[in-house]
Regions:
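N-terminal signal-anchor transmembrane helix
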Residues: 71-93, 122-126, 131-134
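Post-Walker A helix-loop "phosphate-sensing" segment adjacent to the P-loop in P-loop NTPases
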Residues: 110-120
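Flexible loop/turn segments at secondary-structure boundaries
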Residues: 232-235, 255-258, 318-321
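Glycine-rich phosphate-binding P-loop
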Residues: 93-110
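Short His-Asn-centered micro-motif
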Residues: 94-96, 225-229, 314
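PAPS-dependent sulfation machinery
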Residues: 123-224
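PAPS-dependent sulfotransferases, especially Golgi type II membrane carbohydrate sulfotransferases
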Residues: 1-72, 82, 193-194, 199-205, ...
Length: 391
């Protein structure tokens, strides 16, 4: 990991709104981060007073796992770096965090041909290869039955997104702008690739590809399906690494995306904060980041070779998931449908009783702001801006 330039945004004193949140996740994503990375983050950024206990426990767990992290790299590092995706282009699921990417990923994960990042490997990424045979059953007993933000069922083997383990080993990820909320340059540089140096871009490419190599090694297959909303505006960068990659993009009504993402920020992401941002700042971030992510995807999707992109509408996928999966396999020319269709059908049968969260009505000022700032999103996929008629 190469150390990038220090983010330019300076810490500010921001005490508007209480730091109280309905925390739902006790563990921090950085508990098994690389020691060098965690020390660099602490050197570059201030941890606000309400989160110093959280920082203390990160330091403790990082210290406890340091030897085992070193041992995993010594045993598996060289083997992982030999893995190539030249003849096994990944399938990338793109879309906003709250647009149905998890539902789509869960369906794909039932295909016995495909490997994917599991929750176990996500949570214990830097020691997962070393410990999966004996620690995974232990972790399974302590995992919650559902995700805090949406009540989706989870277990140690359920699919997860690879930006999370990337944040444990690399500075080159926008997730650090979640942890250190005033440091938005991580999002700008490593999600939107704005103001990024060639050295930093090369660092992101190396670190990201190595995460995929580790996922492949863990699964015993180079055929991967990956769900990562942070990748949505990275089409160009992904094609530079994997020119024959397949893409599935899922979109949802923008009002629902906003409400669900704000809920995600307050129920789950806030439990990872190391710097305070107010609830109003969270709303600003949902709108501004959503606009940037979607608009960069729209500008870049034409770069994807014909036949390598399928776009899916969430409300249709929700009602006719099996038919949509069959269409995706056919349009992308994916092999193995005959073996996958049974397990995929079983998955959709298993989630028939699932109930989505219900949210309070949008404030009028937010409704108007979403109409204005997300206009391109409404127009591109033909969503109505009338809340009374939304589909």
């Amino acid at each position: 990991m190469t150390t990038p330039s220090t983010p330019s945004s300076a810490p500010k004193n921001n005490t508007s709104n209480s730091t109280t949140r309905a925390y739902k996740v006790k563990e921090h994503q950085l508990y098994v981060a690389r020691p060098k990375l965690w020390n660099t983050l602490r050197r570059l950024h201030t941890v606000d007073k309400p989160y110093r206990r959280r920082s203390f426990f990160i330091t403790r767990f990082v210290t406890i796992t340091t030897f085992f992290q070193w041992l995993q790299r010594a045993i598996y590092g060289r083997r992982a770096r030999k893995i190539s995706f030249e003849n096994n282009p990944p399938i990338f699921i793109l879309g906003h965090w709250r647009s149905g990417t998890t539902h789509l990923h869960y369906a794909f994960s039932r295909d016995p041909r495909l490997g994917y990042l599991s929750n176990f490997q996500t949570f214990l990424y830097t020691v997962a290869l070393l410990s999966k045979t004996w620690l995974r059953p232990v972790v399974s007993r302590f995992m919650p039955e559902t995700r805090p933000q949406d009540n989706v069922k989870v277990d140690a083997d359920a699919p997860a997104e690879e930006e999370q383990p990337l944040s444990m080993v690399s500075l080159y990820t926008g997730i650090h702008s979640f942890f250190f909320g005033r440091e938005t340059s991580y999002f700008e540089k490593y999600t939107l690739f704005q103001g990024i140096s060639e050295e930093e871009k090369a660092g992101w490419q190396e670190d990201y590809n190595h995460v995929l190599q580790q996922i492949a090694l863990y699964n015993g297959t180079n055929d991967l399906v990956l769900k990562n909303p942070w990748n949505t505006p990275r089409v160009q960068e992904l094609l530079e690494l994997y020119p024959e990659a397949k893409f599935v993009f899922i979109h949802r009504n923008p009002y629902d995306v906003f409400l669900s993402t704000r809920h995600l920020m307050r129920k789950m992401i806030s439990s990872q904060y190391l710097q305070f941002i107010s609830m109003r700042e969270e709303e600003d971030r949902v709108i501004e980041w959503g606009k940037a992510i979607y608009e960069r995807y729209i500008a870049q999707r034409s770069m994807i070779p014909e036949g390598n992109l399928v776009e899916v509408r969430f409300d249709i996928f929700e009602q006719n998931g099996y038919t949509e999966m069959e269409r995706i396999y056919k349009e992308l020319g994916l092999p193995g449908w005959d073996d996958a269709k049974g397990p995929i059908a079983d998955y959709f049968e298993s989630v028939k009783g699932y109930k989505k969260n219900r949210f309070r009505k949008l404030r009028p000022d937010l409704e108007e702001r979403i109409k204005k700032e997300w206009k391109t999103i409404f127009d591109t996929w033909n969503y109505t801006t009338d809340l009374n008629e939304k589909t």
